């Protein structure tokens, strides 16, 4: 659009200027033959040049009707030529000088008047009625003879000289018929639409030669930076006969560079003023070297600037020697030259814009190829940098290219601090040539250490990779410049290296002798940290690097930085992967069971399943030693016929079981024994619950493996804790964090040498069993259970009996895994409450960590301060998760009813305990929940005159007797009955006399713990029993009532009295309940 706009403006401006060009020779009498070529110069020349007077011209042939006297156009009797004809009669106002139509001052005859404009049909030479029409030559003569003085009759437009006509190629011979105005317009059209800069410059020089009758011309284009401008000869010494190809080839073969201010063209470029020289050899600015080489003698020179629309110099045009016999370029030539170059400036700028767009497209293609190479070559830094340097050398046409890589680990602290203090310095990308000053010397004190140097020389030279030493870097000028760039982060463009070396007192080494220009730029990564320096040396044409080169190189450096950074990251990743592989090998060695353990387990006899109680839903591992747990696992695999069915080597199976046990951490609940209990429940569901008939052998294998591995490497914390602490596991797995980790650990063990129990499976079976294992382990996340539960319930409620579909089988296996994972809730009470204590302790440990590390209040079930609420929370857990699951499973598979019934029984026990806690009991500080009475408190609004506490330590045989004795003492009311001395010899007695409000809390600070050994040698359970006797002084005026527990006192046992009969009945019931407890 911009180019089209300029072309339209160009055409409009041409129309406005053409009229004034015709006025150059309005007074031919004042023109010398040298100044103006018209028919009055010489007979031969006039005859040769003017086709109207040529005898061979049909216009002058007597037989030609236009020149024949009998021709009515030339006949005196013809009214057009007759003096009496008003058109030719002097008295005719049209030809009368006094007639305003012919008066030069008349605007109708003014060259700028459109009525006299060559494009105006009244003044157009081609118009037969116009006196200047060549075909009307006789008419013009007749008019003159009849006294017509009109200036129009004397106008003779300038035409091409004979020499210029002879120089025209065949395709441009039509120009000889045009006068100067039409020729000017035609030559403007000739260049208006040309966008090839070479063709355009050639046309400009040829056309200027035609307009000014110049022998030859040259055109220079401005190049360089604002501080270093120079002219480059685009085309030089172009004549009318010089072909475009020859002119371009010669200009490129011998490139002529002229700095601004040097020579005639340089002065014109610097001053923007025209220079017209009559005698070139008498001007000191003229350089005669070209004449001496070519043998051509330059006489007259006309040199004029070419500016763009902003007035900036974009080139200089120069024409030499006149061809029409004139010794110099006159004012008319200067004016024509100036006007034509005005349009040429617009055309040159359009062509340059077009050339820039083409170059930009090519550069983008090169950058895209570079980007493609970067992403294709990311595993080898040397190959990548070699490709980058090759592309840079081809793009910017330089002789050599180097890349220095920085060792970031060796950066000095002061430099790092400077980067932190002034980060904007790393973002600055300014091009400047290093001049004087202390900046370079100051920056040498803060150096980055270069570790690798890549160098690429000529086109046929291979890349050189070296690791320069500090000594080599300190004695290399190029390395010193690279050090400066890496330290400051600035782009450096040195136009004259030798001058720079002198200014900075650097020692000239051999590599500097052949260096004249250097472009050096930092290479940064995504964090704007300098990771290297790219250095270009010497433009191929000997010129300094331009501003355009800097811009291109900056984009190139960005791609270079991305490629090097990515490749370095890839190499680091490869190193980390190698380290990880070594670490996994070490981990695998230490995580795998030893050979001695494997051989021992392999040789141990394996008892029958009944001896381990594997078929029962009441299985417990409390009585099993660690080796027995491994044997029990082996027996389950044998009973399911998995060893022979899938050809599992027995020693591999033994090693795998021992390795799985070894990879469980010694946390309080989620340990190896929990995994054993889950696997045993699955085994019981398959065998006793008869669910194996719905499973394939491969699925049974996968489910047993998943049960044993479902909590591998458990840390005693849940998924929420991993997320809150932003642990590496939470970063690695965003959902089901621990479950994904458990599966990965399972895979790691299977991949360890000698542990792959799936080694005999086919690829298809292997994929199938691993899919089962993964899905089953992930199903142990309760979040997954809640997602799948509704779909499973819907299938069961619809009476589904076919579980062979892939989705339905996945649902069923997921529900079975959850049922096995929480199966401790269905164990006998003596097992269940011990397991609940272990779970609570692990939860409380996590709650303590949350308080310590996160400074947050944990949820109730993990808050140690709310330990007495655990029975109530257990009831909620059963109601929300366990009972619905076991109920729906029993509805479909009635053989697993024991799980449902055991859960119901334990719910009643937990509910009972929860009610006791509400009455004032606490239990969590004990190892077991047997008789969890700990504290006793008085009740408000009552007076206690004498409260006596007796704390007695009992054994198991004394327990029931103590309970009955306590009940008896409570029934006696205020009698002070003491335990016999021989029954409390192992205990202690504390009597407290207290008067005052009953709301005062009185606690027993003394307690003894009895460890009852079930086998007579090892403590198994502990019991605290507080035996109390309350004696009250009877007041004659106030009735007394037995002490009752206070329902509003949580964790305490209180004594109270009431005068209300209704309250007495209610308290009596609570008293009875308390007595039953004791």
From Swiss-Prot:
Occurrences of domain PDEase (ranges): 594-917
The active site annotation covers 670 (proton donor)
Q: Tell me the residue numbers annotated for binding a divalent metal cation 2.
A: 711
GO annotation, biological process: cGMP metabolic process; signal transduction
Q: Which domain of life is it from?
A: Eukaryota
| SMART domains listed in its UniProt record | GAF, HDc
Q: Which stretches are tagged as biased composition: Acidic residues?
A: 46-64
Q: GO CC: one term?
A: plasma membrane
Identify its protein family. Belongs to the cyclic nucleotide phosphodiesterase family.
* Annotated PANTHER family: CYCLIC NUCLEOTIDE PHOSPHODIESTERASE (PTHR11347)
Q: What is this protein called?
A: cGMP-specific 3',5'-cyclic phosphodiesterase
Gene symbol? Pde6
């Amino acid at each position: 659009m911009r180019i089209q706009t300029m072309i339209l403006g160009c055409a409009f401006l041409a129309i406005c200027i053409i009229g004034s060009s015709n006025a150059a020779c309005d007074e031919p009498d004042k023109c010398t033959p040298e100044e103006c070529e018209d028919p009055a110069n010489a007979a031969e020349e006039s005859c040769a040049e003017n086709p109207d007077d040529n005898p061979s011209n049909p216009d002058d042939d007597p037989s030609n009707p236009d020149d024949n006297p009998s021709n009515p156009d030339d006949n005196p009797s013809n009214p057009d030529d007759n003096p009496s004809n008003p058109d030719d009669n002097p008295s005719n106002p049209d030809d009368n000088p006094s007639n305003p139509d012919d008066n030069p001052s008349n605007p109708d005859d003014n060259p700028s008047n459109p009525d006299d404009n060559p494009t105006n049909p009244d003044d157009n030479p081609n118009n037969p009625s116009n006196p200047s029409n060549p075909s009307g030559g006789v008419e013009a003569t007749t008019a003159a003879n009849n006294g017509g003085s009109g200036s129009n009759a004397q106008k003779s437009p300038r035409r091409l000289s004979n020499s210029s006509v002879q120089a025209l190629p065949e395709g441009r011979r039509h120009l000889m018929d045009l006068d100067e105005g039409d020729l000017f317009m035609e030559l403007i059209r000739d260049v208006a639409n040309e966008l090839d800069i070479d063709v355009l410059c050639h046309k400009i020089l040829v056309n200027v030669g035609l307009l000014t009758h110049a022998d030859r011309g040259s055109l220079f284009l401005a190049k360089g930076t604002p501080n270093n401008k120079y002219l480059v000869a685009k085309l030089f010494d172009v004549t009318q006969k010089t072909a475009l190809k020859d002119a371009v080839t010669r200009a490129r073969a011998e490139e002529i560079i002229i700095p601004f201010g040097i020579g005639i063209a340089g002065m014109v470029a610097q001053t923007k003023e025209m220079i017209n020289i009559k005698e070139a050899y008498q001007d000191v600015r003229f350089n005669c070297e070209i004449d001496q080489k070519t043998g051509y003698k330059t006489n007259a020179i006309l040199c004029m600037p070419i500016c763009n629309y902003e007035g900036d110099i974009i080139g200089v045009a120069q024409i030499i020697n006149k061809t029409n016999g004139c010794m110099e370029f006159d004012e008319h030539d200067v004016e024509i030259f100036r006007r034509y170059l005005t349009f040429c400036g617009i055309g040159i700028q359009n062509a340059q814009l077009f050339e820039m767009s083409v170059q930009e497209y090519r550069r983008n293609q090169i950058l895209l190829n570079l980007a493609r190479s970067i992403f294709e070559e990311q595993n080898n830094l040397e190959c990548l940098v070699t490709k980058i340097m090759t592309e840079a050398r081809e793009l910017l046409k330089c002789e050599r290219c180097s890349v220095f890589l920085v060792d970031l680990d060796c950066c000095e602290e002061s430099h790092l601090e400077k980067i932190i203090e002034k980060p904007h310095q790393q973002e600055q990308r300014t091009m400047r040539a290093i001049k004087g000053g202390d900046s370079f010397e100051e920056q040498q004190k803060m150096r980055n250490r270069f570790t690798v140097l890549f160098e690429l020389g000529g086109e046929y030279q291979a890349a050189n990779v070296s690791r320069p030493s500090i000594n080599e870097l300190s004695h290399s000028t190029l390395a010193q410049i690279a050090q400066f760039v890496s330290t400051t982060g600035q782009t450096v463009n040195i136009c004259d290296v030798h001058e720079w070396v002198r200014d900075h007192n650097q020692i000239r080494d051999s590599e500097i002798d052949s260096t004249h220009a250097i472009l050096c730029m930092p290479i940064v990564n995504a964090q704007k940290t300098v990771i290297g320096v790219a250095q270009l040396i010497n433009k191929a044409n000997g010129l300094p690097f331009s501003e355009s080169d800097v811009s291109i190189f900056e984009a190139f450096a960005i791609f270079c930085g991305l490629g090097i950074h990515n490749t370095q990251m890839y190499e680091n990743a490869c190193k980390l992967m190698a380290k990880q592989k070594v670490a996994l090998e070490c981990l695998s060695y230490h995580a795998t069971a030893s050979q001695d353990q494997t051989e021992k387990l392999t040789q141990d006899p394996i008892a029958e399943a009944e001896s381990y109680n594997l078929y029962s839903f009441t299985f417990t591992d409390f009585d099993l030693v660690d080796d027995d747990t491994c044997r029990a696992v082996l027996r389950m695999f044998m009973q399911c016929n998995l060893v022979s069915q899938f050809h599992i080597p027995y020693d591999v199976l033994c090693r795998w079981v021992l390795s799985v046990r070894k990879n469980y951490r010694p946390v309080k609940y989620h340990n190896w024994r929990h995994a054993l209990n889950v696997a045993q429940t699955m085994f019981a569901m398959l065998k006793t619950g008869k669910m194996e008939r719905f499973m394939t052998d491969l699925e049974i294998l996968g489910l047993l493996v998943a049960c044993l591995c479902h909590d591998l490497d458990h840390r005693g914390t849940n998924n929420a804790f991993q997320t809150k602490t932003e642990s590496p596991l939470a970063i690695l797995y965003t959902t089901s964090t621990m479950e994904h980790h458990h599966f990965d650990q399972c895979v790691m063990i299977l991949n360890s040498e000698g542990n792959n129990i799936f080694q005999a499976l086919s690829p298809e079976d292997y994929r199938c069993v691993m899919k089962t294992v993964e899905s089953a382990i992930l199903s142990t996340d309760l979040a997954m259970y809640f997602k799948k539960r509704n779909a499973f319930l819907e299938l069961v409620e619809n009476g589904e009996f076919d579980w062979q579909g892939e989705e339905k089988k996945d649902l069923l296996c997921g529900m079975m895994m959850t049922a096995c994972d929480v199966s401790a809730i269905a164990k006998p009470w003596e097992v269940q409450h011990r397991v609940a204590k272990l779970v609570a302790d692990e939860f409380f440990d996590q709650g303590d960590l949350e308080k310590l590390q996160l400074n947050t209040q944990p949820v109730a079930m993990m808050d140690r301060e709310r330990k007495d609420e655990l029975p109530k929370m257990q009831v909620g857990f059963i109601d929300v998760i366990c009972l619905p699951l076991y109920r729906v499973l029993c509805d479909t598979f009635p053989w697993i009813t024991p799980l449902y019934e055991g859960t119901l029984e334990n719910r009643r026990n937990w509910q009972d305990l929860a009610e006791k806690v509400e009455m004032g009991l606490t239990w969590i500080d004990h190892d077991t929940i047997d008789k969890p009475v700990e504290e006793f408190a008085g009740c408000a609004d009552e007076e206690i005159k004498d409260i006596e506490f007796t704390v007695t330590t009992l054994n198991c045989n004394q327990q029931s007797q103590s309970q009955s004795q306590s009940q008896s003492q409570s029934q006696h009311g205020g009698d002070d009955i003491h335990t016999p001395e021989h029954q409390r010899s192992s205990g202690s007695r504390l009597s407290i006399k207290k008067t005052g409000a009953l709301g005062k809390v009185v606690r027993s600070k003394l307690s003894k713990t009895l460890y009852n050994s079930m086998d007579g040698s090892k403590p198994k359970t502990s019991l605290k029993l507080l035996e109390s006797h309350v004696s009250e002084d009877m007041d004659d005026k106030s009735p007394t009532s037995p002490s009752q527990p206070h329902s509003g006192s949580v964790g305490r046992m209180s004594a109270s009295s009431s005068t209300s009969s209704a309250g007495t009945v209610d308290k009596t019931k609570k008293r009875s309940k308390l007595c039953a407890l004791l």
